[in-house]
């Protein structure tokens, strides 16, 4: 497993390979998945956290089932750009995943992703109880969509197409 920049990931991905988005929380791991054209992020059910070995196995099972080519994981930065309190835990999680997978990870600034996800769920008139269930995967979708948009810009500037 390697930590890459989004530009490095763009160079390593083959056409029609999907990537997953992760929003790492203390109780859940929010999941999202790209389409094969890497244009759209779609929320997936969360992984309820138990302990690392169980969480990692659930994530790897998801990656295998969905044929994931790499992960984009939200990095919880403070609004001023400094490392937030959960940055260290996120980096430790990725380091520990090195023992479990050769798939690459990209860190993606997740500032305001949960706020945007909550606002979207409110606009969709999702009840408070359902919002609580869906917020982490919705945030993972915002994280992944940001990375997908960047990949799209990189492809256009290189004259490449994903599909």
Swiss-Prot record:
Known EC number: 3.1.-.-
UniProt-listed InterPro entries: RNaseH-like_sf, YqgF, YqgF/RNaseH-like_dom, YqgF/RNaseH-like_dom_sf
GO terms, biological process: rRNA 5'-end processing
Main location per the UniProt record: cytoplasm
Pfam families in alphabetical order: RuvX (PF03652)
Coiled coil location: none
Transmembrane segments: none
Enzyme superclass (EC): hydrolase
SMART domains assigned to the protein according to its UniProt record, in alphabetical order: YqgFc (SM00732)
Top-level taxonomic group: Bacteria
MF (Gene Ontology): nuclease activity
Subcellular localization: Cytoplasm
Alphabetically ordered keywords of this record: Cytoplasm, Hydrolase, Nuclease, Ribosome biogenesis
GO CC annotations on file: cytosol
Family annotation (PANTHER family): POLYNUCLEOTIDYL TRANSFERASE, RIBONUCLEASE H-LIKE SUPERFAMILY PROTEIN
NCBIfam families: RNAse_H_YqgF (TIGR00250)
Family statement: Belongs to the YqgF nuclease family.
Function: Could be a nuclease involved in processing of the 5'-end of pre-16S rRNA.
Name by which UniProt lists this protein: Putative pre-16S rRNA nuclease
Species the sequence originates in: Rhizobium leguminosarum bv. trifolii (strain WSM2304)
